[in-house]
Design a protein with these regions (language model features):
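Recognition helix of helix-turn-helix/homeodomain-like DNA-binding domains
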Residues: 26-41
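DNA major-groove recognition helix of helix-turn-helix/homeodomain DNA-binding modules
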Residues: 26, 45-60
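Short, charged recognition helix plus adjacent turn
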Residues: 60-75
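DNA major-groove recognition helix of helix-turn-helix
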Residues: 25, 36, 54, 65
Length: 75
């Protein structure tokens, strides 16, 4: 899953508007919308803010993992 789809799904699953999430990353609603639609790139500092806000790992957010939280090591 690509990160834009994950962004939208996380926002919708938490019953949030684009404007509400845009405030978290200090963007306008339009700026946030452009990221979700693929017309602008998500900056790394905004990725970190969103991961902290949603309490998910960056691997999950960008689609590397299907697990929202870091898996414990089997050591």
């Amino acid at each position: 899953m690509d990160y834009r789809t994950r962004m939208r799904n996380l926002r919708e699953d938490n019953d949030l508007t684009q404007k509400q999430v845009a405030i978290i990353i200090n963007k306008s609603q339009q700026g946030y919308s452009h990221i979700e639609e693929g017309r602008a790139e998500l900056k790394i500092d905004d990725l970190i803010k969103l991961c902290k806000f949603y309490n998910v790992s960056s691997d999950y957010f960008i689609g590397i993992s299907e697990y929202p939280h870091t898996e414990p090591s089997n050591k």
